[in-house]
Swiss-Prot record:
It catalyses: alpha-D-glucose 6-phosphate = beta-D-fructose 6-phosphate. Its EC number is 5.3.1.9. The lineage of its organism: Bacteria, Pseudomonadati, Pseudomonadota, Gammaproteobacteria, Oceanospirillales. It holds the Pfam family PGI. The gene is pgi1. This is Glucose-6-phosphate isomerase 1. GO terms for biological process: gluconeogenesis; glucose 6-phosphate metabolic process; glycolytic process. One of its GO terms (molecular function) is monosaccharide binding. The keyword Isomerase applies. One of its GO terms (cellular component) is cytosol. Belongs to the GPI family. PROSITE patterns: P_GLUCOSE_ISOMERASE_1, P_GLUCOSE_ISOMERASE_2, P_GLUCOSE_ISOMERASE_3. Keywords: Cytoplasm, Gluconeogenesis, Glycolysis, Isomerase. InterPro entries: G6P_Isomerase, G6P_Isomerase_C, Phosphoglucose_isomerase_CS, SIS_dom_sf, SIS_PGI_1, SIS_PGI_2. It is found in: Cytoplasm.
Length: 548
């Protein structure tokens, strides 16, 4: 069986790590005045500078060789053609089909999926235009003014991030709210400022069985019925994005208002599907299509560009260099753009849920590091929060700086200050400051690596390309590590145990460890046979004891 760490290229990279460990990035520039030109590239409205990395020409060449010798070409072709590459769930992975814009068919299990995708796009178009124009009315005959998306994970993070990033394109008479946390204070704070007559709820759940989402959806429906309409009015104020049409209809949602998506769409890759309905409602269907077009453009680049000029591949390989050879444990995402303040959270799920794996596709434990801890926040704020550790701490943290170049009219001075701060930080991380007359506490060692990603402007098209770029970067790393980037069994384990605890909280908890039992006893003091599950269990016991 193939052993990644025993390959000739891997061992060559281990030797290069020893040979280049003491190199300074700034010396690479001194030795090669063309380094910036060589190590930067543009795809559409995105520009990547990867020259400020602790990567010599020899290292980069070996990293590309690593990709050449991997299964990347084969696995990439399999993904785009609808072959089953999510092997643990026996599914194809076809989020790229959701933004496919050509006339060519795309197959999954021998069936062309494009007709259904195009039909759902048309459904999104009709519905979003009806709501935005005011044609869609609530039970009182008033137009919709507030849209509440109820979801969690991929059903929340993607549309939430995109709607906030593209806020300047938002319909002026529509407000958007996102409820994800099962903590009741989250939905309470949203509902208390809304009018049920003018509020539309989108219940976004792949299976229509996600505990957190269903509990929030039931709370929203109860609030709606208590404050306004009757059961028959639910259909005018609740719609769903789900694969489970039957369950959505049982909830009270009209069949024509269940927006389909498919089992081959992973949650963290679902914003291109009907899960992206809030985006279409916010920026309009044309804007939503521009988002898809930008992602599709990045898809074509990923397929067609040679590895040495392939933006997602290069970002993935540089990440592998730091994780597997330099020993970096984390990766910071720092957008110098307030509109992108949700991007670090979105990319955190995309990367950590995809590549947080320790078993390979051959069911063998890996003997090398896989996905990094991804974190970050907006740059200007981050400078006054965690940059101190990045400059002078003992952690080695590669950074992605992200910014858009075009300023908002009237705020040019703000945007110029923002961009100059970003450029200064990238330079400072690389150069450092070491003055022999100063004491060590005043010195910054520098030699800290970073990429800089510049968007011409933060538009739907460029945002789509940016997200697709990171999707493909994560995929490439998963292929090289021989792991399945498209399942999430760790997430499923927690869900299962939560269900077991909920079912047993009022009965037998002896199967759990002593700590869990002790904590449950404290919980019981506040929920003495009063939890919804306990009540249901009690009612079931009573009904079983009755005779008819």
């Amino acid at each position: 069986m193939f052993q990644l760490t025993r390959s000739v290229t891997w061992r060559a990279l281990e030797r290069l790590k020893q040979e280049t460990f003491d190199d300074r990035i700034s010396d690479y520039f001194a030795a090669d005045p063309q380094r910036f030109e060589k190590m930067s590239l543009r795809v559409g409205g995105l520009f990547l500078d990867y020259s400020k990395h602790h990567v010599s020409d020899a290292v980069l060449a070996k990293l590309i060789e690593l990709a050449d010798h991997s299964a990347l070409v084969q696995r990439r072709a399999q993904m785009f053609s609808g072959d089953i590459i999510n092997v643990t769930e026996d599914r194809p992975v076809l989020h790229t089909a959701l933004r496919h814009l050509g006339d060519e068919p795309v197959y999954a299990d021998g069936k062309d999926v494009m007709p259904e995708i195009q039909s759902t796009r048309e459904q999104i178009k009709r519905f979003s235009e009806a709501v935005r124009s005011g044609e869609w009315k609530g039970y009182s005959g008033e137009r919709i003014k507030d849209v509440v998306n109820i979801g969690i994970g991929g059903s929340d993070l993607g549309p939430n991030m995109a709607c906030r990033a593209l806020l300047k394109y938002r319909h002026p008479e529509l407000n958007f709210h996102f409820v994800s946390n099962v903590d009741g204070t989250h939905i309470q704070k949203v509902l208390q400022r809304l009018d049920p007559a003018t509020t539309l709820f989108i219940v976004s759940t792949k299976t229509f069985s996600t505990q957190e989402t269903l509990l929030n959806a039931k709370t929203a429906r109860r609030w709606f019925l208590d404050n306004a309409g009757e059961d028959a009015d639910v259909g005018a104020h609740f719609i769903a994005a789900s694969t489970n049409r039957k369950a959505a209809m049982e909830f009270g949602i009209r069949e024509e208002n269940v927006f389909e998506f498919w089992a081959w769409v992973g949650g963290r890759y679902s914003m291109w599907s009907s899960i992206g309905l809030p985006i279409a409602l916010s920026i309009g269907f044309d804007g939503f299509m521009e988002l898809l077009e930008g992602a599709h453009e990045m898809d074509r680049h990923f397929i067609e560009a040679p590895f040495a000029e392939n933006m997602p591949v290069l970002m993935a390989l540089i990440g592998i260099w730091y994780i597997n050879f330099i020993g970096a444990e984390t990766h910071a995402i720092v957008p110098y753009d307030q509109a992108l303040h949700q991007l670090p959270s979105f990319l955190q799920q995309l990367d950590m849920e995809s590549n947080g794996k320790s078993v390979d596709i051959f069911d063998q434990p890996v003997n090398y590091k896989t996905g990094p801890i991804v974190w970050g926040q907006t740059g200007s704020n981050g400078q006054h929060a965690f940059f101190q550790l990045l400059h002078q701490g003992t952690r080695y943290v590669p950074i992605d700086f992200i910014a858009s170049l075009k300023p908002e009219p009237g705020f040019e001075d703000h945007h110029f200050a923002l961009l100059t701060n970003m450029l200064a930080q990238a330079n400072a991380f690389m150069e450092g400051s070491q003055d022999g007359s100063q004491l060590d506490p005043y010195s910054c060692p520098g030699n800290r690596p970073s990429s800089t990603l510049l968007l011409d402007e933060l538009t739907p098209r460029n945002l789509g390309a940016l997200i697709a770029l990171y999707e493909h970067k994560v995929f490439v790393q998963g292929v090289i590590w021989n792991i399945n980037s498209f399942d999430q069994w760790g997430v499923q384990l927690g869900k299962r145990i939560a269900g077991e605890i909920s079912e047993r909280i009022d009965t037998n908890v002896g199967d759990f460890d002593a700590s869990t039992q002790g904590l449950l006893s404290l919980v019981r003091e506040y929920f003495p046979a009063s939890t919804p599950d306990a009540k249901a269990s009690d009612n079931n016991k009573k009904s079983r004891g009755k005779t008819s």
